Amino acid sequence: MTKTKIIFMGTPQFAATVLKGLIDSNQYEILAVVTQPDRKVGRKQELRMTPVKELALTVNLPVLQPEKLSGSVEMTQIMTLLESGEVGIVTAAFGQFLPGKLLDVAQFAVNTHASLLPKYRGGAPIHYAIMNGEKEAGVTIMEMIRKMDAGDMIAQDSTPILEDDNVGTMFEKLALVGRDLLLETLPKYLSGQLKAQAQNEDEVTFSPNISPEEEKIDWNKSAREIFNKVRGMNPFPVAHTTWNGERFKIYETKVVDDSVGNLQAGEIVEKTKKSLKVATGEGLLELLFVQPAGKPKMDIVSFLNGLGQKIQVGDKFGD
């Protein structure tokens, strides 16, 4: 059987799961893997490879890491590979816009996008689906065109978003959905069995990358909205407020259905040895996992036994 030649482009674990599926299927000859450059991460600022690069190196695939594709040496290398004939591009959460001339030369170009298009075009579809309280999320296999995430759709599959899901758990679930959907549908698409369908432009919504401003918790929102925001940013970039003038990250919360009464949003209304409840614009929110400035992530009991001993009912989170 002749293997389909492809160049794979992707960056996070979501993309690594898709790449592993392509490798294991033994149907594809992967000429190169393109991923983001190594980045410094964490408090120690250690240089870290992307999950896609880590996987590619374990199976001796050539890795290209352009800071930006346009005008790069790597772009020239990719063009040379594409011009060698009958080579396609497969992407999954690559994190860069593909120059049009790559799309022009590639035999085909398909993207594994983590949303039920036309909803949530852009770089943070899973975050927004959770933050907006959606009951399901999904993956779309789509043709790539010059406009972001606007190409015709080849296939779609969905999975429920449960109450205890967050960005991390949904990334894991959707990576498997995306992997299986791509492996099932790409051969049918390339053979002409599957025809791509246009997106309904009237139903388009966007999910741009999360800005630092959006990471801040607005305590005037309802407890449910803040609950969704917190899990829609856990484990990254992490929602935060301020306490004692310093950043205070919140990883996990629980909506408490008590009537709030005449309390100020952000005010601490109940403190025990094991729990901390905060007033919001509507309802109470119980904090479960937090991270004070300069400290590791901890459960609320650990916080209350340490730094949190200072916190009092009537104190306020936020500016």
Swiss-Prot record:
<dbReference type="Pfam" id="PF02911">
    <property type="entry name" value="Formyl_trans_C"/>
</dbReference>
<keyword id="KW-0648">Protein biosynthesis</keyword>
<dbReference type="Pfam" id="PF00551">
    <property type="entry name" value="Formyl_trans_N"/>
</dbReference>
<dbReference type="InterPro" id="IPR036477">
    <property type="entry name" value="Formyl_transf_N_sf"/>
</dbReference>
<dbReference type="InterPro" id="IPR037022">
    <property type="entry name" value="Formyl_trans_C_sf"/>
</dbReference>
<protein>
    <recommendedName>
        <fullName>Methionyl-tRNA formyltransferase</fullName>
        <ecNumber>2.1.2.9</ecNumber>
    </recommendedName>
</protein>
<dbReference type="InterPro" id="IPR002376">
    <property type="entry name" value="Formyl_transf_N"/>
</dbReference>
<feature type="binding site">
    <location>
        <begin position="115"/>
        <end position="118"/>
    </location>
    <ligand>
        <name>(6S)-5,6,7,8-tetrahydrofolate</name>
    </ligand>
</feature>
<comment type="similarity">
    <text>Belongs to the Fmt family.</text>
</comment>
<dbReference type="InterPro" id="IPR005793">
    <property type="entry name" value="Formyl_trans_C"/>
</dbReference>
<dbReference type="InterPro" id="IPR044135">
    <property type="entry name" value="Met-tRNA-FMT_C"/>
</dbReference>
<dbReference type="InterPro" id="IPR005794">
    <property type="entry name" value="Fmt"/>
</dbReference>
<dbReference type="GO" id="GO:0004479">
    <property type="term" value="F:methionyl-tRNA formyltransferase activity"/>
</dbReference>
<keyword id="KW-0808">Transferase</keyword>
<dbReference type="GO" id="GO:0005829">
    <property type="term" value="C:cytosol"/>
</dbReference>
<dbReference type="InterPro" id="IPR041711">
    <property type="entry name" value="Met-tRNA-FMT_N"/>
</dbReference>
<dbReference type="InterPro" id="IPR011034">
    <property type="entry name" value="Formyl_transferase-like_C_sf"/>
</dbReference>
<comment type="function">
    <text>Attaches a formyl group to the free amino group of methionyl-tRNA(fMet). The formyl group appears to play a dual role in the initiator identity of N-formylmethionyl-tRNA by promoting its recognition by IF2 and preventing the misappropriation of this tRNA by the elongation apparatus.</text>
</comment>
